[in-house]
């Protein structure tokens, strides 16, 4: 059975991003494991935690809780990441979580030539986002995650579903969300 990891980085009740993500998940078949980033209360990595992680990695000891998120991410068949567009990217809690996922010898390794090589099982990552205004000229939150997925994690395909301009005066929010759901439906019809 397909193992789907759903990373929920939506802190608000009634999140429109979460609404779109749930719509996508309703199309998918498999076992969904949901991780709600804001409930994890992760602290940024610091000198002490980085030294601990480096030492554990050097000793090939990956039993420590610091590797929990990397192991969870690496074993998933498909990733669904939902994050609102905040301050030109995504909520800071997601960046902190990504730092935990960036664990050498679990989600990636370096080749002899010092290039990253992905170790993740997933072949596809879906990124779901909404924005009150335009994401100008590109969605930098998605671009960042896309870069990590392809360059470090070895996930060859990333897909962005986004609804923009939801808070613009006079915007038909329901129509914008409906169009985004239709894009998900069309994608799923053509690629499932």
Q: Locations of the language-model features?
A:
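Hydrophobic residues at beta-strand termini and immediately following loops
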Residues: 35, 128, 161
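Conserved nucleotide-sugar donor-interacting segment of glycosyltransferase catalytic cores
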Residues: 103-113
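N-terminal beta1-alpha1-beta2 submodule of the flavodoxin-like/Rossmannoid cofactor-binding fold
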Residues: 1-103, 182-192
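Glycine-rich phosphate/pyrophosphate-binding loop and the adjoining helix
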Residues: 136, 144-192
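A structural micro-motif
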Residues: 2, 30, 123, 155-156
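Short, well-ordered alpha-helical segments in soluble proteins
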Residues: 98-101, 105, 129, 153
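Short, glycine-/small-residue-rich phosphate/pyrophosphate-handling segment
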Residues: 111-153
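Short histidine/acidic/glycine/proline-rich micro-motifs that form metal-
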Residues: 10-14, 132-136, 166-168
């Amino acid at each position: 059975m397909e193992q789907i990891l759903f990373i929920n980085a939506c802190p608000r009740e009634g999140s429109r991003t979460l609404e779109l993500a749930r719509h996508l998940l309703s199309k998918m078949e498999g076992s969904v494991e949901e991780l709600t980033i804001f409930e994890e209360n992760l602290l940024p990595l610091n000198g002490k935690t980085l030294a601990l992680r480096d030492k554990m990695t050097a000793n090939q000891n990956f039993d420590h809780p610091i590797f929990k998120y990397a192991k969870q991410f690496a074993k998933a068949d498909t990733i669904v990441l939902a994050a609102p567009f905040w301050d030109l990217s995504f909520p800071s809690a997601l960046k902190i979580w990504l730092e935990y996922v960036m664990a050498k010898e679990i989600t990636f390794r370096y080749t002899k030539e010092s290039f990253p090589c992905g170790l993740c099982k997933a072949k596809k990552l879906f990124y779901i986002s909404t924005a009150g205004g335009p994401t100008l000229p590109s969605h930098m939150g998605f671009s960042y995650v896309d870069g990590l997925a392809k360059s470090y994690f070895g996930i060859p395909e990333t897909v962005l579903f986004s609804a923009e301009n939801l808070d613009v005066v006079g915007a038909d929010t329901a129509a914008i969300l409906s169009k985004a759901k239709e894009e998900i439906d069309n994608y799923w019809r053509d690629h499932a």
